[in-house]
From Swiss-Prot:
It comes from Escherichia coli (strain K12). InterPro entries: PheL. This protein is involved in control of the biosynthesis of phenylalanine. The lineage of its organism: Bacteria, Pseudomonadati, Pseudomonadota, Gammaproteobacteria, Enterobacterales. Keywords: Leader peptide. This is phe operon leader peptide.
Amino acid sequence: MKHIPFFFAFFFTFP
């Protein structure tokens, strides 16, 4: 659980 911000950013940045 260390890639939470990265994962969220990737998911949120998706169109």
